[in-house]
Design a protein with these regions (language model features):
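Amphipathic alpha-helical assembly/interaction segments
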Residues: 1-120
Length: 120
C-alpha cells in the first residue's frame, strides 16, 4: 500500500477505537456505573497494569473478564486510550516520513524522470 493509504487506514483504525471507547462510556452511563477518573480508588492500580512492560492478554485478563461490568468496561477504556495514543504517535511518524520521503506516486514519477534523464 502507499504511504497515503497507510496513513488513512491507520486514522480509520484510531477513529474506530475512539467510537468503541465512547460506546463503553455510554454503557457505563446507561447503567449508572462510574467512568474512572484520576480520583477513583482503582485508577492508580489500573494505570500500573496498563503501563506494564511486555504486557500480554494475561496481564489484563482479570480486568477484562471481570464479572463486574464497571471494572471490565473501565479496563477496556484504559486499553483503548493507550492504543489510540500509540496510533496517534504512529500517524505523526508516518506523516513526517511522507513529507520527507514522499509517497509512492512521487517516487515513481522521480524514477521515470531519472530514467528519461539517463536516456539522453
Amino acid at each position: 500500500t502507499s504511504k497515503e493509504m497507510e496513513i488513512k487506514l491507520t486514522n480509520v483504525a484510531r477513529a474506530s477505537l475512539e467510537e468503541l471507547m465512547n460506546d463503553y462510556k455510554d454503557f457505563l452511563r446507561i447503567r449508572n456505573l462510574t467512568i474512572w477518573d484520576k480520583k477513583h480508588r482503582y485508577y492508580s492500580q489500573l494505570t500500573k497494569i496498563l503501563t506494564a512492560k511486555d504486557a500480554t492478554y494475561e496481564t489484563y485478563r482479570k480486568g477484562i473478564e471481570s464479572p463486574d461490568p464497571e471494572v471490565s468496561a473501565n479496563v477496556m477504556i484504559g486499553l483503548i486510550n493507550i492504543t489510540t495514543y500509540l496510533l496517534a504517535k504512529q500517524i505523526k511518524t508516518m506523516e513526517k516520513e511522507f513529507l520527507q520521503e514522499g509517497g509512492l506516486r512521487e517516487k515513481m514519477s522521480q524514477a521515470r524522470m531519472d530514467v528519461r534523464r539517463n536516456q539522453k
